Amino acid sequence: MVFGWRKAFCTSVSSNQDKPQQHSSLHTTDPPIPTPRFRSKFGFLSNPSTPRLRSRGGSGTGCRSSASTSVTIPSLPTSPKLHCRTTSNATPRTSNSSSPKFFSNPSSPKSSSSSSSQGGGGVSLLRATLLLNKSNSSRCAICLQRVNSNQSNSTAAIFTAECSHSFHLSCVNGLEDKRCPFCSAAWNHAPKSNYPAVNNNFGSDPIRRPEIREIKTGKSLRVYNDDEPLAYSPVSLAQINTIHESDENDDVEDDDDFPGFFRDSSITSDMVPSISGNLEVKLLPESAVVETGKKKETHVVIMKLKASPSPSSITDAIKARRPSIDLVTVLDLSNGGANLQTVKHAMRSVISLLREMDRLSIVVFSTGSKRLMPLRRMTAKGRRSARRMVDALGGMETTGGVGMSVNDALKKAVKVVEDRREKNPSTSIFVLSDGQDQPEAVLKAKLNATRIPFVVSTTRFSRPEIPVHSVYIASPGALLHAPLRDAFTERIASLLNVTLHNVKLNLSLVNGSHLTEISSVYSLTGRLENFGSGSVIQVGDLFAEEEREFLVELKVPTSSSGSHQVMSVQSSIVDQMTHQPMTCPKEKRFLIPRPQSVRYVSSSIERLRNLHSMCRAVADSRRLIEREDLSGAYQVLTTARSNASHSDDSLRSLEVELNELSRIKPRNSILNRTEDKPEQLTPTSAWRAAEKLAKVAIMRKHLNRVSDMHGLENARF
């Protein structure tokens, strides 16, 4: 039944269509095309070869369909009649049209009954082609960027060809064949090559150029994560004790202790107490009363720590076993001549002290700052490249702006340490300069105290806890003499070695009233820190001859304010060989000097009071910042700054805290603004607010009803 119906339906087509079909497939020629441009635009309407199901040699069961159909589009009255050709074989024919392939009608075995759907598809394809031509007219066919002559910010010249297509003039100049890339029409009036050809990768896009310029001129520091990976040298077999195979018949077990991996270990347990005792603690002779109350007074005194140099035998042993270090050197090239040669001599000494597992980076500054070398291991190749780079340094005479360059160079040095991918156990930053940025009186006092032509001062960046050693070489030819050069090398070597690891101090009061207590301890070196009312102070690592200052605050009863107080200090360190905590056996006791009254005025006492007010202000501001009270923290810091003297060092610390607060405040205000932003007044928001108010009113009414009935449960209504 099914096959008979299909045969009857398919053979009902008029047989007159076979003759035109055969005639058109054998003798039909293409109509003349007016212009190549029209063919390129409407060539997509030629239906590609669609395989049709047709009868073979009088077979009665095949379905025959017309092979040639003409498509008439009423929306294009001036267009010529388009013919759709279909070959008799099932192999599709490739269209030579220049239109895009994704706009061509895909070949599908459809019958002639779907002509209406094909007509709708032709209209949609025509619409898509018109949109394509419209978008192509606003783009350059060479660089594929937009061509908008109406934009005011567009500075690229535009060339409009005879075929009404627009291009960038710089892109057209690079063409060898003067033909339109869209329609292949020849140009009679070709543009003159007055402008150099521009790289087509970027073109003349007015949107891209500001982004590239912004990246080039940005002031943000780059990411310095190109450090050389750590590769420790293999341990020599001579330093490892070989384990001999025991005899199977030998039943006697040796009771000898394990000698350790290093046979020639020069550090013994007898040296540990001397290492732990190399910490000098002293109290300054001035003490001041900063606050007086009805029951208690507040006294302050400064405690100073210093890591004294170790004996030569222990120092050599520590150098042999010291951990590897990541060192960033900051070199001052602002003054040429003899000062530059001195900096080069100092840098060569630093390079000679580094071992193969250490890494070195070089940053220089003059009128600007630049990183010359990333963190590189000091192998033989690394030493040669570092020395070659130091020898090629050149100085520049500058008159001003060096201070800002020093700050930028230090920021880059800290960025090198922070962005490194791999880390050595120890990290340091060396600043080698002639000390011109230091006050002359301070530099002379330090030189007279040490009697050597260079001064070393150590500070710390407390955010990443990086020690910064500033080496000021006052005399230009100081390192030309052998004794001074040896002293400088020994001093630099002591800075590379951490003398005391993880130092802790335990403070307590021996005599006096039980109401006397140590209320707070403030660190004055580096970033200010408050250790609170606890008696344990975390000092950290100390280099050789490094000094730390702490401000100790005492709460003393008013009745015993005139009596002397005794403070005991007990220190503990971590041994760098065994990594075990060790306590110094000797407890040090100090007599706290009698404080001066509030009315007493002197420069040292005034400095103590300013330091105390500054430390209290910084501690209070940080406490308020933790509570997100930025306005209160700003008010506390500004009040302390107005009360501080301009010649005091505490003013600099207050300025640092204010700058940090100013960076936090805009970010927090933006967050609060986004969180507390009121909802825009719309009918929906008004309806939502009315619903909330209605719910609140219903809840209140319900609560009022419950309160009215309260106590009437047993009223026997």
Curated annotation (Swiss-Prot):
Residues 95-117 have a biased composition (Low complexity). One of its GO terms (molecular function) is zinc ion binding. This is Probable E3 ubiquitin-protein ligase WAVH2. Residues 326-456 form the VWFA domain. GO terms for biological process: gravitropism; root development. Signal peptide: none annotated. Pfam families: VWA, WAV3_C, zf-RING_11. Residues 13-28, 85-94 have a biased composition (Polar residues). It is an enzyme of class 2 (transferase). The gene is WAVH2. InterPro entries: CLCR (IPR051266), VWF_A (IPR002035), vWFA_dom_sf (IPR036465), Znf_RING (IPR001841), Znf_RING/FYVE/PHD (IPR013083). A zinc finger (RING-type) spans 140-184. Residues 13-120 are annotated as: Disordered. PROSITE patterns: VWFA, ZF_RING_2.
